[in-house]
Amino acid sequence: MTTITIALSKGRIFDETLPLLAAAGIVPKENPETSRKLIIETNQPNVRVVIVRATDVPTYVQYGAADLGVAGKDVLIEHGGEGLYAPLDLNIAKCRMMVAVPEGFDYENAVRQGNRLKVASKYTKTAREHFASKGVHIDLIKLYGSMELAPLAGLADAIVDLVSTGGTLKANKLVAVEDIMGISSRLVVNQASLKVKRETLQPIIDAFAQAVEK
């Protein structure tokens, strides 16, 4: 029996992937929010789910530790996508990648005057490419969380981060000033697995595709 391993991260992506898994006849036996297990069995004896950090999903799939995974476009851009086949935009976990600054900071004027800006982000590749395309000189500061704190603490002039409702920005007196791109999560597949296990993997991929189209 061919074993299939699916890499998912906790939280919104896991929750929004459940209906897609169900469409493929796959139901995890436990919820990662309440279980301490990192390998979760499913109702299909040959399918298991591994729970990893969102940023690690592409790596697990790339190196074959997982055959399939679900990862945000933001994560895939930073990863680079080597060794991955990304056949399907799942249209889940949607948000925007944006530039935000403190209220009262004249971002347009700073850019117009050619000021060198300090920008904090965990999406350093995306941030670097965005500002380079605009001809804006920046000092990039890589952070791993609490991005909104950076301008408040004087660490950065601006941040590049994911924005869903804008509530967190507003609560920290920040405003979005540029929309970089829309973000949603994609199905990613290990290229070698697709060749070796196509008979088992393709029906899962097809079921996901049909569920997304509905």
UniProtKB/Swiss-Prot annotation:
Enzyme Commission number, as recorded: 2.4.2.17
Q: Where in the cell is it found?
A: Cytoplasm
Q: Which reaction does it catalyse?
A: 1-(5-phospho-beta-D-ribosyl)-ATP + diphosphate = 5-phospho-alpha-D-ribose 1-diphosphate + ATP
Pathway annotation: Amino-acid biosynthesis; L-histidine biosynthesis; L-histidine from 5-phospho-alpha-D-ribose 1-diphosphate: step 1/9
InterPro entries, sorted = ATP_PRibTrfase_cat, ATP_PRibTrfase_CS, ATP_PRibTrfase_HisG, ATP_PRibTrfase_HisG_short
Which EC class does it fall in?
transferase
What are this entry's molecular-function GO terms? Answer: ATP binding; ATP phosphoribosyltransferase activity
GO biological process terms, alphabetically, are: L-histidine biosynthetic process
Q: What keywords does the record list, in alphabetical order?
A: Amino-acid biosynthesis, ATP-binding, Cytoplasm, Glycosyltransferase, Histidine biosynthesis, Nucleotide-binding, Transferase
A GO CC term attached to the entry: cytoplasm
Question: What's one Pfam family the UniProt record gives for this protein?
Answer: HisG
Keyword Nucleotide-binding present in the record's keywords: the answer is: yes
Q: Which NCBIfam families match?
A: hisG
Per the entry, what this protein does is: Catalyzes the condensation of ATP and 5-phosphoribose 1-diphosphate to form N'-(5'-phosphoribosyl)-ATP (PR-ATP). Has a crucial role in the pathway because the rate of histidine biosynthesis seems to be controlled primarily by regulation of HisG enzymatic activity.
Question: Subunit notes for this chain?
Answer: Heteromultimer composed of HisG and HisZ subunits.
Q: Which protein family is named in the record?
A: Belongs to the ATP phosphoribosyltransferase family. Short subfamily.
The written remark on domains in the entry is: Lacks the C-terminal regulatory region which is replaced by HisZ.
Cited HAMAP family:
HisG_Short
Q: What protein name is recorded for this chain?
A: ATP phosphoribosyltransferase
The organism's taxonomic lineage, starting at the top? Bacteria, Pseudomonadati, Pseudomonadota, Betaproteobacteria, Rhodocyclales
